[in-house]
């Protein structure tokens, strides 16, 4: 278990307290639709089912998912109180519930609740492996058997960046002075992610590496899909 009062989470909650931008430019990333959300193109498959956006920001991804399929519900969870309050007011007529999490797990969410979980430009901002593992392990708990987790992280060589330092995948850098690209994690090889997800309990894991989009902190992104066993 990760202590929710750790230095990194305290810094992150402080920086995100008033909210973030909604990053509408990332809707123009073709890989967002063709890889990250490609499974939603078969809209009938998701009719009446539940989806979740982890690190949902101001609701862009939730809104996009709602527009693609006839879901029962598409929820959002985020560390920022400002973001969650915004979404509760802005999307109050949508089929969505909104949760503010503690930064180390998603304990307010039910077991076996979601058929599809996504996350983008989020996990790459957490250079603390133990926190990422805690979050991903808890997201697995919330997936229904056979459910899909689709996410993206920064990928490339070395640890240099014009925006600030990068940490390796298994590093625990609790004393980062900033988040949201100021001190990211960088995946160096696909096997690190695949092996980690297998150890957590996911199955049928696939990855695709593509050039990054509107992200000068990483030359490439890795898109990952992993399933909960039936």
Language model features by range: what are they?
Residues 54:
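Conserved beta-strand/loop positions that form the S-adenosyl-L-methionine
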Residues 65, 138-139:
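Class I S-adenosylmethionine-dependent transferase superfamily signal
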